[in-house]
Amino acid sequence: MVTTSGQTTQGYVIEAYGNLLRVRFDGHVRQGEVAYVNVNDAWLKAEVIEVVGQEVKIQVFEDTQDVCRGALVTFSGHLLEAELGPGLLQEIFDGLQNRLQVLAESSFFLKRGEYVNALCKNTLWEYTPKAVVGDVLVRGDALGVVKEGYFNHKIMVPFSCFKEVTITWVISEGEYSVDTVVAKARDADGQEYSFTMVQKWPIKQAFIQGDKVPCHEIMDVGVRILDTQVPVLKGGTFCTPGPFGAGKTVLQHHLSKYAAVDIVILCACGERAGEVVEVLQEFPHLTDPHTGKSLMHRTCIICNTSSMPVAARESSIYLGITIAEYYRQMGLHVLLLADSTSRWAQALREISGRLEEIPGEEAFPAYLASRIAAFYERGGAVRMKDGSEGSLTICGAVSPAGGNFEEPVTQATLSVVGAFCGLSKARADARRYPSIDPMISWSKYLDQVGEILEDKVQGWGEAVKKANYFLREGSEIGKRMEVVGEEGIPMEDMEIYLKSELYDFCYLQQNAFDPVDCYCPFDRQIELFALMSRIFDARFNFDSPDNARSFFLELQSKIKTLNGQKFLSDEYKEGMEVVLRLLETKMVQTA
């Protein structure tokens, strides 16, 4: 079992450069080890990022003002770890897993060197043992369960225990705090272990026990353009790059509200503090459409905003994914929303510059692509020993400067994700929300989704490809019309253009502030998409471009009204009949 050394190494500061300190020490220090720097009776948390002989470079997670040459540094003997156990949900952490609500009680402003336990030690949890004396277990096996909200939170053999252990004692059912010993065990060498409800794990190491399996279940998010044009599977990875003001954060908030997953980890890494405040104000009052419970019951927030130290941005990303992996091991489906990975990459660039490493493109470190790949590879679906499956879906927002998708962070991300939802400034300016551009977005999961839906909807994949064809052709025809006008193109092209505009306006665009249209269930999407496919296949008889435009504008209005009606209500059914009758008045034949 991995344990913390009882002896601590000490050293002293010999050079300070911003939040990077050079420290000389006597003893043994590991890469990634946590250190504490003494400043005016406060101890500032830091991480070892480079070891050279008897000197190390450490990045401090707080303001290093007043740090002087000779300041005492103590090395803790353990890596930067996450504390995992009951009580993570409904909490708001910073990048070092301090509970911000507890810190707020002590002072209006965050004090330097003040840290609190990640899990409340006073809360009592109803514990039900599952293991019995004599059971032979390995890491990740269940010792018992507690009820956390409406989830069965599995208390597992710690992942730091790499040996088979035999249970020698189990606590009886009852209410206990997280630091209560709930089981004891012994390994083959006779070493004794005591297990509590809490375990710790280094955040930069993958937290997984079981077999990775191919993703095979659709993640319904209630956004038509995502579910249809750019689908994602549970356990998949996707990114949402876009310029300032394109709607990245609003889209991520929508995903956190309506995605068909069990747990949502919202990692606000370097974004504006106002957006985090909006989440904290809204979520407790919003209802999860899948369970009817408060959204906060399934949400954990790590809000390392741009006003916090740059060094903590990196730790917040890794903390978020470690918590997500922990819940995946319980057989739950988890969605991690990282907003934004560009701020994390900028933190890497800053630290790399202070380490005087050879820079890569745009001064980002040469290892940027491998760091981003390692982050996204921690996602995926996992089958546990008991046959249950859990998944971790990762969505990373990318904020390229000026909306330039050719910059290094976006390109490194595109090479490893399974779907790309590119947000367009032009669509946002035209108020075509969500502003995901279907012309540049893609998904590697489209064929798999078609196979999954084959029993329910025959030819789904081909129908989506046909819709993409109309979008591409309509876009090209629209560009020609800007030059030669409507009179300069044949009626067949005019028809294709109007069909593509109808599909964009009535299907791809969605009103996030409408109580009905904000979330479109998959069954409703299938019915609406079938209507769109029928319109694509239809042939119409128009004697002039004006008549064609008038007809499609009327059709747009009827379908848009239909989108605001409750699914399968009397108003919805009447609206659908009106649309079908209107189609039949101009339809000549069906291909």
Swiss-Prot record:
- What InterPro entries does the record point to? ATP-synt_VA_C, ATP-synth_a_Xtn, ATPase_a/bsu_AS, ATPase_F1/V1/A1_a/bsu_N, ATPase_F1/V1/A1_a/bsu_nucl-bd, ATPase_F1/V1_b/a_C, P-loop_NTPase, V-ATPase_asu
The source's domain of life comes to: Bacteria
What does the record give as EC number?
Answer: 7.1.2.2
Recorded GO molecular functions are: ATP binding; proton-transporting ATP synthase activity, rotational mechanism; proton-transporting ATPase activity, rotational mechanism
Q: Which residue stretches, if any, does this entry annotate as coiled coil?
A: none
Signal peptide stretch? none
Which residues participate in ATP binding? 242-249
Q: What class of enzyme is it?
A: translocase
- Gene Ontology biological-process entries: proton motive force-driven plasma membrane ATP synthesis
Q: Which reaction does it catalyse?
A: ATP + H2O + 4 H(+)(in) = ADP + phosphate + 5 H(+)(out)
Alphabetized, the UniProt keywords read:
ATP synthesis, ATP-binding, Hydrogen ion transport, Ion transport, Nucleotide-binding, Translocase, Transport
The record ties this protein, via NCBIfam families, to:
PRK04192.1 (NF003220)
What role does this protein play?
Produces ATP from ADP in the presence of a proton gradient across the membrane. The V-type alpha chain is a catalytic subunit.
Q: Which family does it belong to?
A: Belongs to the ATPase alpha/beta chains family.
Protein's recorded name: V-type ATP synthase alpha chain
Q: What is the protein's species of origin?
A: Chlamydia abortus (strain DSM 27085 / S26/3)
